[in-house]
Amino acid sequence: MIDILNLTYDELEAWMTGTLGEPRFRARQVWQWLWQKNARSFDAMTNVSKATRARLAEAARITWPEVRTVKTSSDGTVKFLLALADGALVETVLIPSESREGKVRMTQCLSCQVGCAMGCTFCSTGSMGFERNMTMAEILGQVLVAREHLGDDRPDHPIVRNLVFMGMGEPLLNLNEVMRSLRTLNDEFGLCFSPRRITVSTCGIEKGLRELGESGLAFLAVSLHAPNQEVRARIMPRAARWTLDDLMAALESYPLKTRERITFEYLLLGGVNDSIDHARELVRLVSRTKAKLNLIVYNPAEGLPYEAPSQARILAFEQYLWSKNVTAIIRKSKGQDIKAACGQLKASELAELAGMAVTEEPKKEAE
């Protein structure tokens, strides 16, 4: 029995016409039920004949991640602990913002692996180690769960507006499933997210970088976090196997759309990478390409030997970058009180949570 959410549209159409003997238009109907109408069962597909629904139910299943816990931060950030079909546990986060019209909008942070192989020394997920890659169905299942939780069931996504592959895992080490996910996200009859609303963040993996760029399916963000090879090798030992010089050389030829820039994420670690000398090196580095910088203040994580810089050092770092015509924005941290902020996603407590019943706080109304 196949997991039907794991099929791209072309695969679904080929399977339904070939294996089930259905006309092509049936595949389009089923596809829209799966991705636009949040159908959890074939019985819900009311414009599909009963006979076809019965054949579908005999040959396929619709498997969503199981919600184990839902935690809501004082700032409105929502963190889901999800169990996959084999019992593996992952997290996804909804980060709120307010539109110019005063309406609540959400950015969803997606995981793409169970654990992470990169082992970055400042990241809680990195301390978990790597278990396995997630499938397309598991990656996009996070979106389905969040949309259902928020009542966001319209194709124009009035609530969940942006998606960022910045959760657990390194996307370019799960390139095949991430690319399949991006195509389904972009499909106008699927989840229907514009590429301009999707960002894929990578530590800088040579394999896959060019393919992602040429696809045009998402914006690129690079987890840089260091202005030189020595610091990067110390805090990101596995990512540093590909040197900063090689990374920047690849990014110099990365295909960008008009007015598009590469976002560099830079985590400010007190006494490690936050001096003016570091800022000076950083300017020289990122000036090699069209760039903007997201400055992220370190979020404390249990067992990790780092601290946030002082506010004075943070502002001095930012001001130096601006003085050299480098766009730099200090990203406001959200969800710290529920361990949902950058670098805090971790399934270390997941074994004890595995048997926990669903815990969900009252939903907040979104305008």
Curated annotation (Swiss-Prot):
| Cofactor notes | Binds 1 [4Fe-4S] cluster. The cluster is coordinated with 3 cysteines and an exchangeable S-adenosyl-L-methionine.
Please state what class of enzyme this protein is. Answer: transferase
Extract the Gene3D superfamilies matched here. 1.10.150.530, Aldolase class I
User: What family does the database annotate?
Assistant: Belongs to the radical SAM superfamily. RlmN family.
Q: Which NCBIfam families match?
A: rRNA_mod_RlmN (TIGR00048)
Extra remark beyond the main annotation: Reaction proceeds by a ping-pong mechanism involving intermediate methylation of a conserved cysteine residue.
The protein's name in its UniProt record? Dual-specificity RNA methyltransferase RlmN
User: Which lineage do the record's taxonomy fields give for this organism?
Assistant: Bacteria, Pseudomonadati, Thermodesulfobacteriota, Desulfovibrionia, Desulfovibrionales
